[in-house]
Amino acid sequence: LDTTMKTNFKNISILALLAMTLVMMSCGGEKKRKDGRTDTTTQGEISFACDESFSPIIDELVEVYHMQCPNTKLKPIYTNEIDGINMLLQQKTWLTITARNFTPKEYTYVKDGLNMLPEAVRLAYDGMALICNNQNLDSCITVNDIKAILLGKKTKWSEVNPGSKLGEIWVCFDNRKSSAVNYCCDSILGGKPIDSPNVFAAKDSKDVIDYVASTPNAIGVIGSNWLNDKRDSTNTTWNKAIRVMSVSKLDKATPYNSWKPYQAWLLNGRYPFVRTIWALLNDPKRGLPWGFAHFIESPKGQLILFKAGLLPTRGEITIRDVQVHNQ
């Protein structure tokens, strides 16, 4: 009897050990995939690429997502547009937030070359803002003037406004490979390269603002979300040395036909330089990158974008004209 009991006990122990091993293997298979990822939409840690010009609003969205899903950790890598998209194509990240969609060649590469399904999520619209020093009285400018300046056909302020004494025009971008540079070449210049000796690139949007604040004859090119970054004293809302330029589609710019990159003028088409913010995904597992991108396009994410001064892509938006009558 003792021998039988020992044998049975031994068999039971072996079966229990096998069962525990199978459970552990099963759990491990669910938590850790073949690619090493363990993230889901509500837990885990990932890095993602983002155009530096969107850093103020992305920081805010990440903060809200962390509060909503406390078991997640999102780490944005702020870079330029070209490097950010290359990171996605090289599978160094599963999400890139930038100012353009996949090109047909990029889409085909991800779909056929990597055997994955690329996804592009339209998040919001922002304006390509032009800022100048507060000492510059020429705060209204035409689209044609901007084209001529970027092509090097106009290099002095007196060629824009005959009465100006500011001298040469210096144009500062955030990065030579940024979405702002690409937007100007593709959308403003119709595919032509910037060809002016007076155009240069700084390190980032903050440096552009600092440069314009200290240079009376400069124009800075930044994303309009920097106009409302209330956490940073260098932003144009609080920086009294900076003013936002108004842009006109007509041949002569006046305060009555020129518009700034604010939501109402983006919506009705009066401001000419509008770009789309995209979330480009290569996330077949639909994990944390997918969850964060679709959080931004959710009603809560769209409201955050709206309060930050961007124009959401989803939801009904009504801009009402208010008439004030003197009594």
Language model features: what each stretch is:
Residues 28-77, 81-82, 86-89, 121-124, ...:
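Exported/periplasmic ABC-transporter solute-binding proteins
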